[in-house]
Amino acid sequence: MEGSAYTERTLSIAEALHARFPGLVGTVIQAYLHRSDRDLERLIDLKMRVRLVKGAYAEPARLALQRPSEINEAFIRLMERLLEAGRYPAIASHDPALIRATRGFALRMAIDPGRWEFQMLYGVRRDAQLALAREGYGMRTYLPFGVDWYPYFARRIAERPANMFFVLRQLMTR
């Protein structure tokens, strides 16, 4: 999902498509937006697939959490709700702490790894992607393409600058 200016329109379009093509449409929730708890409940009620991300756009404090610790707390809260009630949710993060929190919660709650998946950007933390897949977790690697692939990729790097080191290391080890 793009910036907050598009959130309501994106969700409305996703809901309309989901009504027409049930089970074939999903959308993204950005954990850092203040509205995300309500949006997530709406999507769970509709039984729509949801991909959870932290959120990567500069948003004002009136719309979004600003502190990384608060964003992580929101991500974990939403992740737990999604794993409990979601329809094959996607937990999209490269953050080792959030991956550990997700694995730990799923294990404590006996939520089968076949009911959800991790998602990561192509070229970022490939070692973690392979390890998660070997451990039996669903692992989807996504690759931006088209005319706007580079701005999308740059936002992922800006969201977590350490990702650039992961990408560079992957390029150097090939």
PLM segments and residue spans:
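Positively charged, amphipathic and often flexible ligand-engagement surfaces
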Residues: 1-174
